[in-house]
Amino acid sequence: MVLVNSWFNQPGVEEVVPRSTYLMVMIALFFIDTVAFIFMQLYFIYDRRQFSNCVLSLAFLSCLIYFVITVIIIQQIIEERLTSSVVQNDIAIYYLFRQMSLCILIFLALVNKVSENTKQRNLFSKKMTLCISLFFVFGGPIVAHILSSHYESYNLHIAELTNENGQVVWKASYVTIMIFMWLTLLSVNLYFNGLRYDIWNGVTVIAFCAVLYNISLLFMSRYSVSTWYISRTIEVV
């Protein structure tokens, strides 16, 4: 559906992403993360000794919050409340914070998993880990909101550069940070868990796919916008 919609809805130079495609992919990701959140919560309720599952569920919950906010932002450009360039930058800000929150929360879950496997005392207590996790779940969107177009004095500019085709593109430095974070998580997870645990095999896939679709963002300024479709399709799959 994404590929068909992308073929028949080619954007002009003023748009980077057809809004119908964006909404369709966001709904798919929202559904997937909802299922993952519920599954991890049920898994934690079944075995409360596995606190890492609770932290993993919060990682997917944070994604749900960012998805809802992103859909609201897209509606603003549909209703012509904000310009396309402003909306694209706001979406980039929330995407950056979503990626950072997801990666950091999964890393916290990994730290707890390692301590559970080795029977060693965790660096942080469960209460401290829960507080840190809740900060990223609810505090991250607040910080992203402050850095968006709602507060011009603190506005963060990620998607502000324009290529030769007149399209707004992302600053490579922010994308590089996300790639480095996911590569680090992927390496650490493979080192401690390998391919022994079903859930953590899924984390390996998530981290690997995150590296792929974030690398594809580096080519948005050089190639057509179809690169964006490929990156989002990878994330959905």
Residue ranges and their predicted role:
Residues 1, 13-115, 201, 228-236:
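Individual alpha-helical transmembrane segments in multi-pass integral membrane proteins
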Residues 1-5, 61, 133-141, 208:
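Alpha-helical transmembrane segments
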Residues 3-15, 72-83, 143-161, 214-223:
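Juxtamembrane "helix-exit" motif on the non-cytosolic side of transmembrane helices
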Residues 146-237:
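Interfacial "cap-and-anchor" motif at the non-cytosolic start of specific transmembrane alpha-helices
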Residues 16-29, 91-102, 127-183:
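Extracellular-loop-to-transmembrane junctions of the mid-late helices
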Residues 63-71, 139-143, 208-218:
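Hydrophobic alpha-helical transmembrane segments and adjacent interfacial helices
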Residues 42-49, 110-126, 188-195:
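Cytoplasmic membrane-interface regions of multi-pass membrane proteins
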Residues 118-140, 199-204:
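Cytoplasmic juxtamembrane regions at transmembrane-helix boundaries
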